[in-house]
Amino acid sequence: MPAQAGSNHMLDLMRRNHTREAYLELIKHFRTKIPGVEFSTDLISGFCGETEQDHLDTLSLIQEVEYEMAFMFTYSMRERTHAWHKVEKGVWTDDLHPAIKKKRLADIVQTYRDTALKRSQKVDLNQIKLVLVDGYSKRSTREHPQMTGRTDTFKRCVFNVDCGSDYQHLNNTIQLQEGDYVVVQINEAAVSTLKATPLFRTTLTEFSQMKWKAKDFKVDFNGVLRRENVIV
């Protein structure tokens, strides 16, 4: 959900077809209708005519939405764009000093990182997640092999290679392969990466049928998956 900026003044200058209020209402609607949905966005600092208040409005938007991922840039002129034509005609000026753009971008990045960490620890930590295995982690070693994959919100997840063959046979250990789906429990939640305990290999169909029960699953200190005090 690209926002570009958090102030209506900037959105109008950028010719975006939404207001801050409409954008936030849409975010609220999606979160109500799709529990667990997360958002990524694009943000620009230092667009022509951006004031300090415009910048603060962008920071407050980040804090309110709590994006999972963000692509953040300083504004630079591109030929044939609306802003380029305005500057060429002398209507606008690319009036912010590069140092101000850089400082504002740093503010945006730090605000994003702070809120993303807060949200990840709130919505990811200790949760059961489905992960698509990408392959071995770059930090994997022969002594400590680790895999990496993506959650259903595209967050990177790192975990050991061994897990149960399926949810009925947790003690039947297999080694995960690229392309497998694995159910994990999140142990550590950072801004862009999760660390997890792999529980068992699964399929999309199987997981979709059991996902509504995920809140009932617990992992004890021995790594045994239990539901309602009964070993699954």
What are these regions (language model features)?
Residues 86-232:
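Terminal RNA-binding accessory module
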Residues 2-100:
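Conserved non-cysteine loop/helix-boundary elements of the Radical SAM core domain that shape
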